[in-house]
């Protein structure tokens, strides 16, 4: 795999047929395409994560299973701002719609300028081949002072990698996060089936009388 540089990114965004095109839209300024990455802007929709009275949330917790609402949707117009206080966590999204063709994979990184102020943009990092939508950004202020962030700010950067060949298994239509149009809350509860399988494997291993394997 190799990362696409400036000219290759531009060619990828004009590629024909359209199914093989890298889509990052709207691109408000051509200068967002850097030497080996594309700067992404912060969108207008946010989900503020509320604290719960109970202590934990997880795939098998009551909140996860019952789908209890614990996030508030906030809409900020382009050029408007949101205060992110120390220790606060919100879900945001990119302004740009992204579509990754089957022969490319994306990596999303926070920008150093924001990190030096205490803003962590802990995205899911990897964009699978075949994925499309606006990207959810997990924004957290780990600094000591409130941060004023604006809808439309350059918030992250997209690095695009060329696969050795087109994948036969692109991001599936039945996957958890398909074509989102705004910040999406966690769907960890959909992984409970995997937890049940792990429990059964553990029970079978204990049934053989030996200790669980160590790595």
Q: Where are these predicted regions, by residue range?
A:
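DUTPase catalytic domain/fold
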Residues: 1-215
């Amino acid at each position: 795999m190799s990362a696409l540089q400036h000219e290759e990114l531009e060619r990828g965004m004009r590629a024909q047929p359209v199914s093989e095109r890298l889509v990052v839209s709207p691109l408000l300024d051509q200068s967002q395409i850097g030497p080996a990455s594309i700067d992404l802007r912060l969108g207008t929709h946010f989900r503020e994560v509320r604290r719960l009275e109970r202590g934990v949330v997880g795939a098998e917790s009551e909140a996860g299973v019952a789908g209890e609402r614990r996030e508030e949707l906030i809409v900020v117009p382009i050029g408007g701002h949101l205060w992110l206080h120390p220790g606060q966590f919100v879900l945001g999204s990119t302004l740009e719609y992204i579509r990754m063709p089957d022969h490319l994979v994306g990596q999303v990184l926070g920008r150093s300028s924001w990190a030096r102020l205490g803003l962590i943009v802990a995205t899911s990092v990897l964009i699978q081949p075949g994925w499309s939508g606006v990207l959810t950004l997990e924004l957290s202020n780990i600094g000591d002072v409130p941060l004023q962030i604006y809808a439309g700010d350059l918030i992250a950067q997209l690095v695009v990698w060329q696969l050795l060949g087109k994948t036969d298994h692109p991001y599936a239509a039945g996957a958890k996060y398909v074509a989102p149009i705004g910040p999406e809350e966690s769907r960890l509860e959909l992984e409970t089936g995997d937890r049940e399988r792990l429990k059964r494997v553990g029970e079978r291993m204990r049934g053989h009388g030996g200790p669980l394997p160590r790595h």
